[in-house]
Amino acid sequence: DGNEISGEIYFVLSGPTEWESQWHKSLKPGKSFITVPAAVSVVNEGFEKAVVEMTKYRRKIRRPNKDNEKLAVIFNDYMNCLFGDSTTEKLLPLIDAAADAGCEYFCIDCGWYTDTNWWAGVGEWKPSAQRYPGGIEKPIKYIREKGMIPGLWLEIETVGFDCPNIDKIPKSWFFRRHGKIVSDQCRYQLDFRNPEVQDYATSVIDRMVNEYGVGYIKMDYNINSGIGTEVDSD
């Protein structure tokens, strides 16, 4: 939250609070709760220097990860390219170009699972036969033949209004508030506390890896489910 008052500016990053982060914890008498660690940067050189010091701190506490040491070169077919309208015919020349450019990963973005509206059609996560005659395995296999790791886009936490099996999904799978299923932008938010939802997510990942041959998954998150669910809440 950034605000300017009387020629001065202050910048606040909040943690687990109800006002800024839609989070709260009710404590019974005698009970306590330890919040997440907080960091404060104090400098004399101004805002930019303060941000520099905070960035140094974040880099220092970041867990060791080889992917952070050598970032891979990834080609994604969405932005300034196919925008969720991929087909085998459109992908093959892009795969060639990405390989020639030295890319290590090639990711097929949204839309691979529907013939129509990629946004509201999320949830079942099965390839469109119309977009990929002979199966999505064909372009995925070609990506590997060109020396790259194939990837698919996924938003596992959402189910769209136009999902083919939306009427078969139990209401208990979703966030609910005021007795109604929470929705945002033609999508519903799954509740991953539910073991059935966990099993569903696992089955989707297993299918993408073991059946389609995917070696990379781009996890996206595009909706705002608000303050969460009232089901079994504190």
Pin down the residues of each PLM region.
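Conserved, mostly hydrophobic/aromatic
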Residues: 30, 75, 98, 106, ...
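Catalytic domains of carbohydrate-active enzymes, especially glycoside hydrolases
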Residues: 90-113, 211-212
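Active-site-adjacent "subsite" loops/lids of carbohydrate-active enzymes
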Residues: 70-72, 81-85, 129, 149-151, ...
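Hydrophobic faces of well-ordered beta-strands that scaffold small-molecule active sites
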Residues: 35, 71-77, 104-108, 150-154, ...
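Active-site beta-loop-alpha junctions enriched in small/polar residues
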Residues: 38-40, 78-80, 106, 111-113, ...
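Active-site and adjacent substrate-binding regions of carbohydrate-active enzymes
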Residues: 110, 128, 141-143, 196-234
